[in-house]
C-alpha cells in the first residue's frame, strides 16, 4: 500500500530551504526505497505556511528512508530554517485518481 507523509511547517526562509532540498536531491538520487513523488504547497492566505506531501511505495520504504542518516541530516537542516517546528502526519493512501 502506498504511504504519504505530510510535513507542515512555517518559514520565512523558503528560498534557502529550496536550495537545501535541491542539494539533498542530488545526494540521494537513485537511492532505493526513497520517495517516489513530492508536492510542495504554499498557503495562499499565509505565505510562510508550507505543506510538503511526500509519497512512498510503502510504509516500510518510508521508515527505512526516515532511519537513513542522510535523511536525518536533511531534516535537521530544514528544521533550522523553520519559524516553528515541523509537524508530521503519516497516511496510508486509500485511493488516488488522476483527472487528466
Model-derived features: positions:
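Short S/T/G/P-rich N-terminal loop/turn motif that feeds into the first structured element of a domain
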Residues: 1-72, 76, 81-100
